[in-house]
């Protein structure tokens, strides 16, 4: 993973406006998590790029695809989905440690998430990563952000208790400013603390991209997230169709 300073500074206001629209008109799949004492709100939504003009503008007209191509060393770049995560002020809900790959109906050797903060985020509340975890050769059981398992009997092992054994891992994280980006592989274990700031949101727009060799994976009997319920692709098919548009095509 790497931090890209100022990569999208010129798009901050656009994405903030898009998130305002999104939060006022969420998708049915949106989730809102409350803290233990009912304090704050953690808003999570995805797959709205085709109905929110600001998201679509950023995805197709920023340099995100070119950044993704360089990071993945890929000639082709496709959109997998966008993901919005907003922790309102004084929201004590953490983002649990997880990998993105086990949630997904896609597989491939070239993947990257571009996590773009839209507020100043200090080191103690930023997204953190377990360095090298994308090379462990393991997928861990995906869980919802309230800690419940996405699938109870998926055959995957539970993710290690990172918080109880932080000294056993190399954990990376950066204080970031609006318009910076943190790039990471779908297999990388990551998580974040709650937002303890009393007067500031923690808004982030995450763009999930795939490169050469991306294939659809149907996990029969298991829930994937996002669900993409209307797809007719078969397992092993290349990603095709309007759901996964090419942003760069060789």
What would you call each of these model-derived segments?
Residues 8-10, 85-86, 102, 120-121, ...:
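Short, solvent-exposed loop/turn segments at secondary-structure junctions
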Residues 64, 89-91, 120-123, 135, ...:
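Short, charged/polar surface micro-motifs in flexible loops or helix N-caps
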Residues 105-122, 175, 183, 208-212:
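Short, conserved beta-strand element in jelly-roll/cupin
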Residues 28-29, 34, 140-145, 178-183, ...:
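Non-heme Fe(II)/2-oxoglutarate
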Residues 122-189:
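Double-stranded beta-helix
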Residues 2-97, 103-104, 142, 229-231, ...:
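Non-heme Fe(II)-dependent double-stranded beta-helix
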Residues 100-102, 111, 191-196:
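Glycine-rich phosphate/pyrophosphate-binding beta-alpha loops
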Residues 83, 99, 116-120, 129-131:
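Short, structured patches in soluble enzyme cores that scaffold and shape functional sites
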């Amino acid at each position: 993973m790497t931090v890209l300073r100022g990569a999208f500074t010129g798009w901050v206001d656009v994405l903030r406006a898009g998130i305002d629209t999104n939060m006022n008109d969420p998708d049915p799949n949106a989730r809102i998590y409350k803290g233990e004492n009912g304090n704050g709100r953690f808003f999570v939504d995805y797959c709205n790029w085709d109905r929110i003009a600001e998201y679509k503008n950023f995805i197709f007209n920023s340099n995100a695809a070119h950044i993704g191509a360089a990071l993945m060393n890929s000639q082709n770049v496709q959109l997998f989905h966008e993901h919005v995560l907003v922790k309102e002020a004084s929201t004590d809900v953490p983002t649990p440690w997880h990998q993105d790959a086990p949630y997904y109906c896609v597989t491939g050797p070239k993947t990257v998430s571009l996590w773009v903060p839209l507020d100043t985020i200090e080191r103690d509340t930023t997204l953190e990563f377990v360095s090298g975890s994308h090379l462990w050769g393991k997928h861990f059981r995906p869980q919802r952000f309230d800690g419940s398992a996405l699938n109870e009997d998926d055959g995957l092992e539970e993710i290690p208790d990172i918080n109880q054994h932080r000294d056993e891992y190399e954990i990376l994280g950066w204080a970031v400013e609006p318009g910076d980006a943190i790039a990471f592989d779908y297999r990388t274990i990551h998580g974040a603390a709650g937002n303890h700031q009393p007067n500031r949101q923690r808004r982030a727009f995450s763009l999930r991209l795939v490169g050469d060799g991306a294939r659809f994976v149907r996990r029969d009997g298991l829930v994937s997230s996002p669900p993409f319920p209307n797809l007719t692709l078969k397992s092993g098919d290349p990603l095709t169709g309007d759901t996964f548009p090419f942003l760069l095509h060789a």
